[in-house]
Regions:
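Surface/interface-facing alpha-helical segments and adjacent flexible terminal/loop regions used
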Residues: 1-93
Length: 93
């Protein structure tokens, strides 16, 4: 779920395709909702969040570079790594 969330945040931030924004935002919403559910069901998962962060981001970045080869994406996460921020912030605004 975290990889899918990163993919769609990256798309929304760096791919200028307004006709796709709605779909990407819905996916971001769904992934955030599902991650929050997982954290409520198993709060101990939060401890592993930062450990998984870099691997998930790197996997997402590789995938999105294949999907959008003509677009530029940062090689590192450009925003805060706080769980609450990732699950709530509108990074594209």
């Amino acid at each position: 779920r975290l990889e899918r969330l990163f993919e769609h945040i990256l798309k929304r931030c760096y791919v200028n395709m307004p006709e796709c924004y709605r779909g990407w935002l819905l996916t971001i919403f769904d992934q955030r909702r599902d991650i929050n559910k997982l954290f409520r069901q198993s709060p101990s998962l939060k401890r592993h969040f930062l450990k998984m962060f870099d691997d998930c981001f790197e996997t997402s970045l590789k995938r999105i570079k294949i999907e959008y080869p003509d677009h530029q994406f940062p090689n590192t996460w450009q925003f805060g790594r706080d769980i609450d921020m990732i699950l709530n912030a509108d990074f594209w605004e």
